[in-house]
Amino acid sequence: MAAVENKEETIREFRTHEGDTGSPEVQVAILTRRIAHLTEHLREHKHDYHSRRGLLKMVGKRRRLLKYLQKKDVERYRTLISRLGLRR
């Protein structure tokens, strides 16, 4: 149940309007939280290759969404990466 609450909290924090669940900002924020959680898991379980593959897929999806947002609206992109603390 905690995972659902964390996801809903992330959606509330990054949504662009009421009822927004699918904007690039929300999707990137959810992926970033999942990536951070999975990274912690992999620090403890170094040989969990199935989870590592899932992590790489999530990182790729986040990269594509960020690239899309950067092309579509640079200001929203810059705001998002600063709020999430991403290095780009």
Curated annotation (Swiss-Prot):
GO terms for cellular component: cytosolic small ribosomal subunit. One of the primary rRNA binding proteins, it binds directly to 16S rRNA where it helps nucleate assembly of the platform of the 30S subunit by binding and bridging several RNA helices of the 16S rRNA. GO terms for biological process: translation. It comes from Rubrobacter xylanophilus (strain DSM 9941 / JCM 11954 / NBRC 16129 / PRD-1). It comes from the Bacteria. Pfam families: Ribosomal_S15. GO terms for molecular function: rRNA binding; structural constituent of ribosome. Residues 1-25 are annotated as: Disordered. Residues 1-20 have a biased composition (Basic and acidic residues). This is Small ribosomal subunit protein uS15. Part of the 30S ribosomal subunit. Forms a bridge to the 50S subunit in the 70S ribosome, contacting the 23S rRNA.
